[in-house]
Each structure stands twice: as structure tokens, then as C-alpha cells.
């Protein structure tokens, strides 16, 4: 069986559904496929998002996918003294929501469908269809049969492993151990957490990573940890670190776990090349996860919108060359690469700092008004209060 579309999107996470939504809106016959039977499940996310980027992708908050609206974030150093306070007044980027990720993902897919995109679930891509050096579709298992889905443009949104991108011929990047974060999260009830703030804890409690607490409502929260795998002795280390943190904090130690989530996150540099003739990769597949925060929803959805724009241009001009695809790479790199690269270098350095140095950094930043977590502004503040740290941090300057 063969079907034909203008655009085939592989993967119905936020990036893929965003690409399908905007492609369909532009009048392109669009198919969005998802390998799992249930979009958004299983949840593999801390579920915290800021709100500053939402207007760019025309996303309006909906009560059914919001668990809690927060006023800001608090970042604690190892001693857990005065935290960095990120609020609407001094860092509006950190004001946002704790979401129900499965409902959020379904909502974005529903927006794509409402614009006219077809959606297939339990429909994995099995292989690439090529015409010469151009990607022209995929073989897909759908309703127990193999379907040749032919498309003028293919958008891969299949996560940081991006099997489809590898099958198509994109160079498979072997991630360094410093560029992979192993994560464990408990959804907990009967906890004492502040519903107005997301909390982050730095230091040896989570080597080269952090612990997060995202409130999900009254006495309920996601309590999780991400640890760079280069700091792990064995696969149980991450859970052990999280359990030790919870045990040492009475507000959480009396809580009950009702869900366990595990997974991994890539915190690498952006791919050098993430397109081929007829193929664009978006979101995690293009390695657009922020290296400092590990967050990828915003970057993914914005890149999905960009991919739809370039797909429309390519189809209108019947030009599927690498030169046309490079327009998408330029848009993505212009938007994300400078900050992304800076944050990658910062991540590399911050992972080497002692608890004592991290405490001094938090102490400095807690007294400085900043608009975002900016390496440049942090260093300026450090130079004023702890000049002896400048040499240690010189690789960030």
C-alpha cells in the first residue's frame, strides 16, 4: 500500500506535533505518526515549563494540561542557605507552569489535527525511502500492514537518538559521558512543597547535575534528579542520590511515591549538520536540549515551526536540495546556537566546581538582579564579590 503526502512528520512529541500543526496550517497535506499507542505516554519529563516562549508558537495555556502555575524558581547551593530567586520581576523567563505532560503532548497533537493533519498512532517508521540522495518518505507499520508513505518533505522528531536520521544518513554522534544525564523522578504526595515555586538544588547531592522539585498542587510534587553519567559508579547511583536527598529533607521524607519515572537526556552541543535533501530534524533529534537546564520543549516547538516554514518554501519552489534545507539550519542556529554553545561550556565547567565554590556562586547571584540565567551576568557579579574565583572560572569568560 502506498499513500502520498506533502509532509511526513515522524514523532508526535511537542516538536513533531508543532511541525505538523504549522505545516497543515500552511495548506500542506500532512501526516503525523507516533510509534506508541498513546501520545505523551510514558511520561519522561520533569514537567516544568516557562511561559515566555509560548506566544512564538501561538500556544495558549489550557487548564486541563496545567497542574500548577508558579511565580518563579529558587536555586539552592549545597549549604541550602539563601537561594537565587527567579521571579517575574527579575527573571521573567522562569515564570511558568508545571504541566501534565501526557495531556500537554496530546493537546499539541490535537492542535495539529484541528489544522488538518492526519495522525497515526502505534505506527512506527521502519525504514527510509530514498530517490537518489533525497529522502522521499518512510515505510511505516500501520494497522498491521506495511505502508509506503511518500512525502515531498520529511521531518524527523524522534528524539535525541533519532533512529530515522541515522537511517537516512545523518552522522551518528557518539555522545560523551559528560553529555548524557541519567534521570530519576518520583511523583510524590503528602509532601510539604511551596506551590508558588519550582526548587533546584546544586552540588554533590547531584554530581554535575541538579535535583528539582516541581509542585503539582497541594501536597503533591515531582521530585527528581539528573546526574551526568560520567559521575556515576553504577546504574543505581542516581536513585541512591535522590533517596538520600529525600531522606534528609523532612518535607519530602514523609511523603509517598505514587509514580516512578526514569530516563536519559542529551545535553550535548547542537548537531553540526541536522538536515539532508528532503529531510529536516527538529527538537531533541537536532540536539536542541538546553545543556544547563535539560529542557527541550520550547526549543523543540520553535524548531518545529521553522521546519514547517522551510517545508512550505521547498514545496512551493519544488526545491529539495541541500541548499534549500540549509535555510532551516541557519534559522535554528541563528535562534539557538550562541546561547546553546555558551551553556554547554558553562555546563562543562560547573560540573567540576566544588560545593564551596558553588555556594559562593549562589551567594553572589542571590544578590544580583538578572533577566535570565546568563553566564555573562554571573561572571560580572563574581568579579565584584569573589574576585579570587575569577581564575577558576576563566574558561567561562
Curated annotation (Swiss-Prot):
Residues annotated as binding a 2,3-bis-O-(geranylgeranyl)-sn-glycerol 1-phospholipid: 339, 375
Name of this protein: Digeranylgeranylglycerophospholipid reductase
GO cellular component, one term: membrane
Assigned keywords, A-Z: FAD, Flavoprotein, Lipid biosynthesis, Lipid metabolism, NAD, NADP, Oxidoreductase, Phospholipid biosynthesis, Phospholipid metabolism
Described purpose of this protein according to its UniProt entry: Is involved in the reduction of 2,3-digeranylgeranylglycerophospholipids (unsaturated archaeols) into 2,3-diphytanylglycerophospholipids (saturated archaeols) in the biosynthesis of archaeal membrane lipids. Catalyzes the formation of archaetidic acid (2,3-di-O-phytanyl-sn-glyceryl phosphate) from 2,3-di-O-geranylgeranylglyceryl phosphate (DGGGP) via the hydrogenation of each double bond of the isoprenoid chains.
Coiled-coil parts of chain: none
Cofactor note: Binds 1 FAD per subunit.
Top-level taxonomy: Archaea, Methanobacteriati, Thermoplasmatota, Thermoplasmata, Thermoplasmatales
General remark: Reduction reaction proceeds via syn addition of hydrogen for double bonds.
Pathway: Membrane lipid metabolism; glycerophospholipid metabolism
Alphabetical list of PANTHER family matching this protein: DIGERANYLGERANYLGLYCEROPHOSPHOLIPID REDUCTASE, GERANYLGERANYL DIPHOSPHATE REDUCTASE
Family matches, as InterPro entries: DGGGPL_reductase (IPR023590), DGGPL_reductase (IPR054984), FAD/NAD-bd_sf (IPR036188), Geranylgeranyl_Rdtase_fam (IPR011777), Geranylgeranyl_reductase (IPR050407), GGR_cat (IPR054715)
Disulfide bridge map: none
GO biological process, one term: membrane lipid biosynthetic process
Organism domain of life: Archaea
Source organism of this protein record: Picrophilus torridus (strain ATCC 700027 / DSM 9790 / JCM 10055 / NBRC 100828 / KAW 2/3)
EC number: 1.3.1.101
Cofactor(s) listed in the protein's UniProt record: FAD
Binding of FAD, residues: 15, 34, 45-46, 48, 101, 125, 163, 284, 296-297
Catalytic activity: 2,3-bis-O-(phytanyl)-sn-glycerol 1-phosphate + 8 NADP(+) = 2,3-bis-O-(geranylgeranyl)-sn-glycerol 1-phosphate + 8 NADPH + 8 H(+); 2,3-bis-O-(phytanyl)-sn-glycerol 1-phosphate + 8 NAD(+) = 2,3-bis-O-(geranylgeranyl)-sn-glycerol 1-phosphate + 8 NADH + 8 H(+); a 2,3-bis-O-phytanyl-sn-glycerol 1-phospholipid + 8 A = a 2,3-bis-O-(geranylgeranyl)-sn-glycerol 1-phospholipid + 8 AH2; CDP-2,3-bis-O-(geranylgeranyl)-sn-glycerol + 8 AH2 = CDP-2,3-bis-O-(phytanyl)-sn-glycerol + 8 A
Amino acid at each position: 500500500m502506498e499513500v502520498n503526502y506533502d509532509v511526513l512528520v515522524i514523532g508526535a512529541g511537542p516538536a513533531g506535533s508543532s511541525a505538523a500543526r504549522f505545516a497543515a496550517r500552511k495548506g500542506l497535506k500532512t501526516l503525523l505518526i507516533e510509534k506508541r499507542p498513546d501520545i505523551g505516554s510514558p511520561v519522561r519529563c520533569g514537567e516544568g515549563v516557562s511561559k515566555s516562549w509560548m506566544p512564538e508558537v501561538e500556544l495558549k495555556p489550557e487548564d486541563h494540561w496545567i497542574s500548577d502555575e508558579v511565580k518563579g524558581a529558587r536555586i539552592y547551593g549545597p549549604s541550602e542557605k539563601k537561594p537565587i530567586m527567579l521571579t517575574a520581576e527579575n527573571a521573567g523567563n522562569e515564570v511558568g507552569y508545571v504541566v501534565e505532560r501526557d495531556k500537554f503532548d496530546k493537546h499539541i497533537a490535537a492542535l495539529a489535527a484541528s489544522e488538518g493533519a492526519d495522525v497515526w498512532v502505534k505506527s512506527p517508521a521502519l525504514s527510509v525511502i530514498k530517490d537518489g540522495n533525497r529522502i522521499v518518505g518512510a515505510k511505516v507499520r500501520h494497522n498491521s500492514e506495511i505502508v509506503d508513505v511518500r512525502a515531498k518533505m520529511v521531518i524527523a522528531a524522534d528524539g535525541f537518538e533519532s533512529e530515522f536520521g541515522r537511517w537516512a544518513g545523518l552522522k551518528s554522534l557518539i555522545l560523551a559521558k559528560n553529555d548524557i544525564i541519567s534521570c530519576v523522578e518520583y511523583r510524590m504526595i503528602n509532601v510539604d512543597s511551596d506551590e508558588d515555586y519550582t526548587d533546584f538544588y546544586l552540588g554533590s547531592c547531584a554530581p554535575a547535575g541538579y535535583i528539582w522539585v516541581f509542585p503539582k498542587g497541594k501536597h503533591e510534587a515531582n521530585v527528581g534528579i539528573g546526574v551526568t553519567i560520567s559521575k556515576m559508579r553504577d546504574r543505581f547511583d542516581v536513585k541512591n542520590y535522590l533517596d538520600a536527598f529525600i531522606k534528609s529533607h523532612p518535607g519530602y521524607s514523609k511523603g509517598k511515591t505514587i509514580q516512578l519515572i526514569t530516563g536519559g537526556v542529551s545535553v550535548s552541543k547542537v548537531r553540526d549538520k541536522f538536515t539532508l535533501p528532503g529531510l529536516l530534524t527538529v527538537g531533541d533529534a537536532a540536539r536542541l536540549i538546553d545543556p544547563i537546564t535539560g529542557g527541550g520543549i520550547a526549543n523543540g516547538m520553535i524548531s518545529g515551526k521553522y521546519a514547517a516554514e522551510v517545508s512550505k518554501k521547498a514545496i512551493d519552489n519544488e526545491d529539495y536540495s541541500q541548499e534549500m534545507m540549509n535555510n532551516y539550519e541557519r534559522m535554528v542556529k541563528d535562534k539557538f546556537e550562541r546561547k546553546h554553545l555558551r551553556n554547554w561550556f558553562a555546563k562543562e565547567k560547573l560540573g567540576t566546581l566544588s560545593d564551596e565554590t558553588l555556594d559562593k556562586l549562589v551567594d553572589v547571584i542571590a544578590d544580583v538582579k538578572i533577566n535570565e540565567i546568563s553566564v555573562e551576568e554571573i561572571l560580572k557579579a563574581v568579579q565584584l564579590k569573589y574576585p579570587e574565583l575569577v581564575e577558576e572560572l576563566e574558561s567561562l569568560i
